[in-house]
Amino acid sequence: MARTLEAFLNDERRRVVHLKDVLPPNASDVDWIGYVSREAGDWIVVTRDRRVLTRSAERVALQSARLRLLAMSAGLLKLQHHEQMARLIQQWPRVEAAMALVAPPAGYRLPPRWNGQLEQLAV
């Protein structure tokens, strides 16, 4: 997912980072959240892990890191990878617009439908 986003989004205003490129493969959610919070920039974290918002340690880490999170919906995760990426890229302008309107910590869920609305999440 990160490689596709990188090809689509990298420009002078944006940078896409795959966590596997900067952290060990066994890094925990709390580890990567801490890493991102220490890096400069206005991050939008894209994740397939819906549980990051339901486990208390990860939720506390997200709140203290003051990140913006985009979670893939369960319905979206059932689609083939290329369909997931097509929807993510198609919805990206909406994602950026929505994230610009909320103070971190904040989160949205990306729907599986082409015309689906982003669902704001409690972070």
Feature map (PLM): residue ranges:
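Short, aromatic/basic amphipathic alpha-helical patches
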Residues: A2-F8, S56-S64
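Charged phosphate-binding loop/patch that engages nucleotide di/tri-phosphates or the phosphate backbone
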Residues: V95-V123
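Long, hydrophobic N-terminal alpha-helical segment
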Residues: M1-V30
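Short beta-alpha junction loops
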Residues: V22, D49-V52, S73-K78
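Ser/Thr/Gly-rich flexible loops in soluble cytosolic domains mediating phosphotransfer, phosphorylation
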Residues: A65-M99
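Acidic, metal-binding active-site segment of PIN/NYN-like and related structure-specific nucleases
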Residues: D29, V36, A40-A61
